[in-house]
């Protein structure tokens, strides 16, 4: 997931979902 690079600014739930993208 590309969201991981943005950092802890994003809730874990969103990071988990972005991991599927």
UniProtKB/Swiss-Prot annotation:
<keyword id="KW-0044">Antibiotic</keyword>
<feature type="modified residue" description="Isoleucine amide">
    <location>
        <position position="21"/>
    </location>
</feature>
<protein>
    <recommendedName>
        <fullName>Kassinatuerin-1</fullName>
    </recommendedName>
</protein>
<dbReference type="GO" id="GO:0031640">
    <property type="term" value="P:killing of cells of another organism"/>
</dbReference>
<keyword id="KW-0929">Antimicrobial</keyword>
<keyword id="KW-0295">Fungicide</keyword>
<dbReference type="GO" id="GO:0005576">
    <property type="term" value="C:extracellular region"/>
</dbReference>
<keyword id="KW-0354">Hemolysis</keyword>
<keyword id="KW-0964">Secreted</keyword>
<keyword id="KW-0204">Cytolysis</keyword>
<dbReference type="GO" id="GO:0042742">
    <property type="term" value="P:defense response to bacterium"/>
</dbReference>
<dbReference type="GO" id="GO:0050832">
    <property type="term" value="P:defense response to fungus"/>
</dbReference>
<comment type="function">
    <text>Shows broad-spectrum antimicrobial activity against the Gram-negative bacterium E.coli (MIC=6.25 uM), K.pneumoniae (MIC=25 uM), E.cloacae (MIC=6.25 uM), P.aeruginosa (MIC=25 uM), the Gram-positive bacterium S.aureus (MIC=6.25 uM), S.epidermidis (MIC=6.25 uM), E.faecalis (MIC=12.5 uM), and the fungus C.albicans (MIC=100 uM). Has no antimicrobial effect against P.mirabilis (MIC&gt;100 uM). Has relatively high cytolytic and hemolytic activities. Its alpha-helix has considerable amphipathic character.</text>
</comment>
<keyword id="KW-0027">Amidation</keyword>
């Amino acid at each position: 997931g590309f969201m991981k690079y943005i950092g802890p600014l994003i809730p874990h739930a969103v990071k988990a979902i972005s991991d599927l993208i």
